[in-house]
Each structure stands twice: as structure tokens, then as C-alpha cells.
């Protein structure tokens, strides 16, 4: 999968919540470290669910990360000795993230990004669709539907145990208490007038 003759490319890891995106990002970063490559990991400041300075998977795996407020802040932390740039929760970054990732790949870095490809409504989320379009490698992971056990490609937001309405805020950082994986058929997004 990674037989590329020239340095610099983009890998996207996407899927619903609880599909293993952060776990896969951590796995890839650790593999590069075993190969004596230099990697740096970034995360958005907004993601402080488990740790402010680590990327942490839902099952507890973690790797040190640099929290940044804006996409272009990433450039301040890049050195020539770096081989791999990893970015978790990429859907929370501003619109400049696509350009930042392109520039890094064009400079010869292997760039690995992970994030939700759909928001809780089942619509494309943030800049992830654009990143998928320009990536050399896209890995779409699925979870298991918490309602029926089928493969889950969507994220259900729950508020007091009930599905969130379509016009609720898009970004609400949470974990198992407010989100669960759902398949296409069990994913429900009512309008406020339906509630």
C-alpha cells in the first residue's frame, strides 16, 4: 500500500465515532517510530476530552500531541528532521487545513490525518471530503451499530438519550455519553418540529 517512490503523500483515516480512527493513527505513528523515523502529532485545542497534550483513543491508547488553535500554527512546529506529520480530529480544523496538508506533502512529508467524514446529521464534515479527494490513500473505517449490530458508518448524537435534531449545533465535543455509532438504517435525525 505504501510503495511510493517519491517522498511526500497524504493518508486519510475516516469513519464514524468509535470506528478506531485515532487508534489507527496512533498505530501508524508508532510503526514509523519503530523504523527510526521522526513523527510529530497534532490535535485541535478543542479536543480535550481525555487529555490536553495527547491523542487518546477510546480504548486508552495514546501518543503525545501538540495542541494547536489554527491550521497554520502547525508550520511553527515542523523541523527538517521530521518524516511524518500526523493530525487527529482533522474535522475540527479551520479551512486552511487543506492547504497546510498539501504544502506539507509537497515538501516531502508523509501526512496522516484522521477525522469524522460525516457530522451527526450524516452530512460531509468540515474539510475531510476535500482531504479525501487529494489524498493518495483513504482508509474508511466502520464501527458496529449500537442499535442492531450492523456495520456503522454514521455517528448518532444523543441528548438525554434521544436523537439530536438536524438543526442542533454541529460541533459538540463529547464521548460515549453523547454519541454512538449507527448504521444507515438505525441513524435518526429528526427536525425540531418532529420532536
UniProtKB/Swiss-Prot annotation:
Q: What gene does this protein come from?
A: tdk
Q: Where is it localised?
A: Cytoplasm
Q: Where does ATP bind?
A: 15-22, 88-91
Q: Single GO molecular-function term? A: thymidine kinase activity
Xref: NCBIfam families: PRK04296.1-1 (NF003296)
List S-S links within the chain.
none
Name the UniProt key words of this record, in alphabetical order: ATP-binding, Cytoplasm, DNA synthesis, Kinase, Metal-binding, Nucleotide-binding, Transferase, Zinc
The record lists the catalysed reaction(s) as: thymidine + ATP = dTMP + ADP + H(+)
Entry protein name: Thymidine kinase
Q: Which superkingdom does the taxonomy of this entry point to? A: Bacteria
Residues given in the record as Zn(2+) binding sites: 145, 148, 183, 186
What EC class does the entry list?
transferase
Q: Is-annotated flag, keyword Metal-binding?
A: yes
Instruction: Please list the residues that make up the active site.
Output: 89 (proton acceptor)
Tell me any Pfam family this protein matches: TK
Protein's GO biological process: DNA biosynthetic process; thymidine metabolic process
Amino acid at each position: 500500500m505504501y510503495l511510493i517512490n517519491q517522498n511526500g503523500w497524504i493518508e486519510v483515516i475516516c469513519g464514524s465515532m468509535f470506528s478506531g480512527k485515532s487508534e489507527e493513527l496512533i498505530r501508524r505513528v508508532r510503526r514509523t517510530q519503530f523504523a527510526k523515523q521522526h513523527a510529530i502529532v497534532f490535535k485541535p485545542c478543542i479536543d480535550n476530552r481525555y487529555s490536553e497534550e495527547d491523542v487518546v483513543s477510546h480504548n486508552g491508547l495514546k501518543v503525545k500531541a501538540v495542541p494547536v488553535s489554527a491550521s497554520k500554527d502547525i508550520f511553527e512546529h515542523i523541523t527538517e528532521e521530521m518524516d511524518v506529520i500526523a493530525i487527529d480530529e482533522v474535522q475540527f480544523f479551520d479551512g486552511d487545513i487543506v492547504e497546510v496538508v498539501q504544502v506539507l506533502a509537497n515538501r516531502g512529508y508523509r501526512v496522516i490525518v484522521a477525522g469524522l467524514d460525516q457530522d451527526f446529521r450524516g452530512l460531509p464534515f468540515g474539510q475531510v471530503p476535500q482531504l479525501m479527494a487529494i489524498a493518495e490513500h483513504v482508509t474508511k473505517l466502520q464501527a458496529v451499530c449500537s442499535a442492531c449490530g450492523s456495520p456503522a458508518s454514521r455517528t448518532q448524537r444523543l441528548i438525554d438519550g434521544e436523537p439530536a435534531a438536524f438543526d442542533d449545533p454541529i460541533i459538540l465535543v463529547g464521548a460515549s455519553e453523547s454519541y454512538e455509532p449507527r448504521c444507515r438504517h438505525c441513524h435518526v435525525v429528526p427536525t425540531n418540529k418532529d420532536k
